[in-house]
Regions:
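Short alpha-helix
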Residues: 235-247
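Glycine-rich S-adenosyl-L-methionine
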Residues: 136-142, 195-224, 228, 234-237
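Conserved AdoMet
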Residues: 25-100
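Core SAM-dependent methyltransferase catalytic element
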Residues: 246-272
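Active-site beta-alpha loop architecture of Rossmann-like, nucleotide-cofactor-dependent enzymes
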Residues: 65, 184, 236
Length: 272
């Protein structure tokens, strides 16, 4: 049997060196530091076979988080499967923005629309225990993952299944509505690199603004006065989203927030 060092070095001929180590550490159930301190240890046959399978999947293009079954977001491990998008660091921008709008001692109601893995809703609930968080998704499979993550991480969230506001009882009103909707343009060249993720969570099949426009149009019926509506969007969509808010005329305090890379990432407004 090959040693720890030999195994990841052989794998790095097929996949990225860092990913080769990450996958091996996962197969062994250890940290990457362990790979250094135990580099001469021989692998068992079962671990080697499992590792080879993981490497083969990665070599075919399967994203590492889907192979591992998890992805870290805001310092917490979230279960992921191909039923949900892989949480990305850029999405922490909208979480931080919303948290900044919520005084720690204020009890506010929050709705996360299109929750996917639940990373936004769960993080908001855990970072501010005074928030009453609801979340929706049109996909039952995605909601199952989100509910599992909420249970595993200890977040108290009520989930609704359905398409956007159709999922929400008409009687509910929120202080904040947040969404990371499918916003990628159907002709965006990056879509071809995201083939393993659910296409319906990536793009609306048009210009990427269809769902954003729909939510802006219908959100006033589900927001309290002065309520906040915030979207994550593409780096080049800030101006377009601001224009959509202005088109519907019921909004004030329209603003766009940049991510750590200096790109437009979140646009928000308050109900007038």
């Amino acid at each position: 049997m090959p040693t720890v060092s030999e195994a990841w070095q052989n794998a790095s001929k097929l996949i990225d060196r860092f990913e080769a180590k990450l996958l091996l550490a996962s197969c062994l159930g250890v940290t990457r530091t362990y790979l250094i301190t135990h580099d001469k240890d021989a692998l068992t046959e079962s671990v080697l076979n499992h590792y080879k399978k993981c490497v083969q999947e990665r070599a075919k293009g399967v994203p590492v988080p889907y192979i591992l079954g998890k992805q870290e977001f805001y310092g917490r491990p979230f279960k992921v499967t191909p039923a949900v998008l892989i949480p990305r660091p850029d999405t922490e921008t909208i979480v931080e923005f919303v948290l900044a709008q919520c005084p720690i001692d204020s009890e506010l109601s929050v709705l996360d629309m299109g929750t996917g893995s639940g990373c936004i809703a769960i993080t908001l609930a855990l970072e501010n225990s005074n928030l009453n968080v609801n979340a929706t998704d049109v996909s039952p499979a995605a909601l199952e993952i989100a509910e599992t993550n909420a249970k595993n991480l200890g977040a108290d969230i009520h989930f609704y299944c359905g398409s956007w506001f159709e999922a929400i009882p008409d009687s509910l009103r929120y202080d904040i509505i947040v969404s990371n909707p499918p916003y990628i343009h159907r002709e965006d060249e990056h879509l071809k690199n995201l083939g393993y993720e659910p296409i319906g969570a990536l793009t609306d099949g048009f210009d990427g603004l269809t769902h954003i426009d729909h939510i802006i149009k219908n959100a006033p019926s589900f927001l309290k006065k002065n309520g906040l509506l915030a979207f994550e969007h593409g780096w080049d969509q800030g101006e377009s989203v601001r224009t959509l808010f202005k088109k519907h005329s019921l909004w004030k305090d329209i603003q766009t927030i940049q991510d750590l890379g200096g790109n437009d990432r979140v646009t928000a407004a308050r109900l007038a």
